[in-house]
């Protein structure tokens, strides 16, 4: 406190950290200064002049923008003087001259800073009687964002976010003077993975989303805080509903994780909750169709199998379950006693990781405190998009960035060092001794490092990552992220005694090793690189039970399908993110029909089988799940509900990941990963983003495609009796010969990547042709 400066605001003395912006210092002391352009996560620009305050200077009193003025010791500030009030009235009067009277129909009405500040600080009447300026309204600037230029007050929040934060400067000011407007470039839509953030931070209704437009008023909404489970980042979110329907997701400013930002998939992938295609009651497959069946009959049929002591039971779990779901399956699996049982996680990129007591697990905040960030993992922008934003923020603040190719080509514009084909082979092997790399010695050796390490592609060997890991461990002060990106993967690591991945499932499971298979919240046939193998396995297993929301390629093969609640908004629990920070998942809307949580199903089955009672309630399950943690820091509901723990609690633990030593082999020089948008069943049933992951394409550099004599923009992937017509995209950062295939796009799962895939010129402009 002794280093703080003292300032006088409106006759009251307050203290602040030196060099802090005046608007922030006042905010911290409970003194509100109106603003439009200022946002605490963006660079200050002082454009709107709404935050003008009066300060005393040697030359007398002066009006200054508080968003660009730093505090100094003994500063005297007046935020309520007559001159300040007159300036505020003038700013608002100018803003309202051309602002349309759209409040009765505007989505922002009721939570609009322009409305609120006009009432609090504006003139009582308007002197303007001329015709207002008009534009075509609204205009779509992307598939999910609409722009109303009449409402725009030119605060530049959207343009600054796109430039400073996301690195997608696709929306800008055009024209000049009183004709200035915000718009996108001609024939270049606002195709950003983070465009929804501009809607949330827009202080008026100039930017709106197609998913929420004209749906509800803020005062009609019910809200709760929760955690996004779209990837392992664990972004804090606010869920909004009206009339028991989820209508909107907002980012919550959790300083430790997402700082208020969300990717668009995390923001808009909720509309499936209201889909009429949801499974609403248990069904059983017959020879020709499905028939309804009671849950008790499902339990009865499964109990007959479990009663047979020779039966072998296997679980294939999706990574979007809650910690409590994972814990319940783990306990049920253990209660099977002498049954041969195994638990697998529906993840293709699965390896032991680098978890040991000698290596510090990184926190997301460590990115800003590092000397250098080292990345070798799947494309962060596609798989951990908000972590990608945090990396960009750290680099903007002066942290050095070293990236090993070839997945993170989206970071080449900000990387200090990007190692491509000279250092990293097409199979993701390091070709030179790391200690001989000049740039490593300059930026990494002996420095404070935050490393983000994970396989870039399923065929990357464990040994290649281990080389980099061991070098960093021995030569730097390293903190490490293990870049597993699948939903609640880290919750699975904490809750399951041991866990394997899809590679092990495809190698170990057969009708000889499994009599009963539970597939829970997973569609490996639709999305895995082992799709064909897993399909053959599931078709042979005597009894398959699917717990899911929809029918899809995997659940359609099940003998019993039990509808479950969505982790997003329909059930309570906890979620553990990439830094082992556990936070609450909350319920806001009721589940449709006879759906139930996964833990409820397994508890009911356990009771029907007359096993010793596992737990009595969700709260009891939550407490048991974290019984081995310290009482004060265990992420129980009671602890997480305390105000100091709303952002989550970190508890480190060493997972027991069981993987085979055999590396995956691809026949071609292929690089297989996933894009942010894909063909996942929940995305297909979320109207706003359903088409964003529909296109099929491959990527490579220009010389690679020239070898295949491609020139029409399309080509055909041919393998045995399969033909898929796809677009091809040029990525100049790729080495010669390397081709990227997104595994989560439709029909890509039909390809067997271990076999030869021919690439042939396409003579026709067909969207898709699968024989």
List the predicted regions and their residue ranges.
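A glycine-rich, hydrophobic/aromatic-adjacent loop/helix-cap motif
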Residues: 450-510
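A cross-kingdom feature strongest in bacterial/archaeal respiratory oxidoreductases
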Residues: 38, 330, 369-375, 381-410, ...
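Acidic/polar loop patches that form or flank catalytic/metal-binding clefts of enzymes
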Residues: 207-213, 246-248, 340-342, 403, ...
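N-terminal leader/propeptide and maturation segments of large enzyme subunits in energy/redox metabolism
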Residues: 101-130, 589-645, 714
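A generic structural motif
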Residues: 338-351, 401-408, 476-489, 541-551
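Short alpha-helices
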Residues: 406-407, 413-437, 454, 569, ...
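N-terminal export/assembly segments and adjacent metallocofactor-ligating motifs
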Residues: 2-27, 35, 39, 56-60, ...
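N-terminal single-stranded DNA-binding subdomain of primase/primase-helicase replication proteins
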Residues: 48-70
């Amino acid at each position: 406190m002794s280093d703080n400066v003292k300032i006088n605001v409106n006759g009251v003395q307050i203290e602040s950290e030196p060099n802090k912006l005046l608007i922030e210092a006042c905010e911290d002391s409970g003194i509100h200064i109106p603003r439009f352009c200022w946002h605490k996560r963006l660079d200050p620009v002082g454009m709107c002049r709404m935050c003008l305050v009066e300060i005393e200077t040697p030359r007398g009193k002066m009006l200054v923008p508080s968003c660009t003025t730093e505090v100094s010791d003994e500063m005297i500030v007046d935020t309520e003087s007559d001159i300040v009030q007159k300036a505020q009235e003038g700013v608002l009067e100018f803003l309202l001259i051309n602002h349309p009277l759209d409040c009765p129909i505007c989505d922002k009405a009721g939570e609009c800073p322009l409305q609120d500040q006009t009432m609090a600080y504006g003139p009582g009447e308007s002197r303007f009687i001329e015709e207002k300026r008009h534009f075509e309204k609204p205009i779509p600037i992307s598939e999910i964002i609409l722009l109303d230029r009449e409402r725009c007050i030119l605060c530049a929040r959207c343009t600054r976010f796109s430039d400073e934060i996301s690195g997608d400067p696709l929306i800008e000011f055009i024209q000049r003077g009183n004709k200035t407007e915000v718009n996108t470039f001609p024939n270049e839509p606002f195709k950003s993975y983070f465009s929804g953030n501009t809607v949330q931070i827009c202080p008026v209704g100039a930017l709106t989303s197609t998913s929420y437009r004209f749906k509800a008023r803020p005062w009609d909404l019910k809200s709760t805080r929760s955690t996004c489970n779209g990837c392992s980042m664990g972004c804090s979110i606010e869920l909004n509903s009206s009339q028991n329907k989820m209508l909107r997701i907002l980012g919550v400013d959790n300083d430790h994780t997402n700082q208020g930002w969300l990717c668009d998939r995390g923001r808009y992938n909720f509309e499936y909750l209201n889909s009429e295609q949801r499974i609403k009651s248990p069904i059983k497959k017959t020879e020709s169709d499905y028939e309804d069946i009671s849950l008790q009959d499902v339990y009865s049929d499964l109990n007959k199998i479990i009663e047979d002591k020779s039966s072998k039971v296997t679980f294939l779990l999706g990574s979007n379950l809650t910690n409590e779901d994972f814990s319940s399956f783990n306990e049920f699996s253990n209660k099977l006693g002498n049954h041969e049982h195994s638990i697998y996680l529906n993840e293709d990129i699965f390896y032991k990781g680098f978890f040991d007591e000698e290596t510090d697990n990184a926190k997301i905040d460590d990115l800003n405190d590092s000397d250098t960030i080292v990345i070798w993992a799947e494309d962060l922008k596609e798989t951990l998009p908000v972590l990608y934003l945090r990396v960009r923020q750290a680099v903007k603040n002066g942290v050095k960035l070293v990236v090993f190719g070839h997945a993170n080509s989206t970071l080449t514009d900000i990387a200090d060092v990007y190692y491509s084909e000279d250092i990293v082979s097409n199979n993701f092997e390091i070709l030179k001794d790391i200690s001989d790399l000049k740039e490593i010695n300059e930026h990494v050796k002996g420095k404070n490092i935050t490393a983000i390490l994970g396989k870039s592609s399923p065929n990357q060997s464990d040994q290649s990552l281990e080389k980099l890991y061991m070098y960093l461990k021995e030569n730097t002060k390293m903190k490490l992220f293990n870049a597993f990106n699948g939903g609640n993967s880290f919750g699975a690591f904490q809750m399951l005694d041991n866990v394997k991945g899809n590679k092990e499932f495809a190698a170990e499971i057969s009708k000889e090793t499994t009599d009963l298979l539970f597939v829970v919240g997973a569609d490996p046939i639709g999305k895995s690189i082992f799709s064909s193998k897993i399909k053959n396995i599931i078709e042979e297993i005597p009894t398959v039970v699917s717990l899911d929301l929809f029918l899809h390629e995997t659940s359609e093969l099940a003998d019993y399908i039990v509808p479950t609640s969505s982790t997003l908004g329909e059930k309570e629990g906890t979620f553990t993110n990439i830094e082992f920070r556990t936070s609450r998942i909350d319920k806001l809307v009721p589940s449709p029909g006879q759906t139930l949580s996964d833990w409820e199903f397994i508890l009911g089955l356990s009771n029907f089988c007359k096993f010793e009672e596992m737990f009595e309630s969700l709260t009891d399950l939550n407490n048991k799940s974290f019984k081995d943690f310290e009482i004060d820091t265990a992420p129980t509901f009671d602890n997480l509900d305390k105000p100091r723990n709303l952002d989550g609690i970190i508890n480190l633990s060493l997972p027991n990941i069981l993987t085979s030593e055999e590396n995956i082999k691809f026949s071609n020089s292929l690089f297989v990963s996933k894009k942010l948008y894909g063909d996942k069943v929940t995305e297909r049933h979320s109207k706003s983003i359903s088409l964003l992951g529909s296109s099929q394409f491959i990527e490579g550099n220009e010389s690679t495609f020239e070898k295949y004599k491609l020139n029409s923009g399309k080509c055909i992937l041919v393998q045995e009796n399969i033909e898929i017509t796809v677009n091809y995209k040029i990525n100049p950062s790729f080495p010669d010969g390397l081709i990227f295939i997104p595994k989560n796009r439709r029909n890509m799962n039909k390809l067997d990547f271990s076999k030869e895939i021919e690439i042939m010129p396409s003579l026709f402009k067909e969207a898709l042709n699968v024989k």
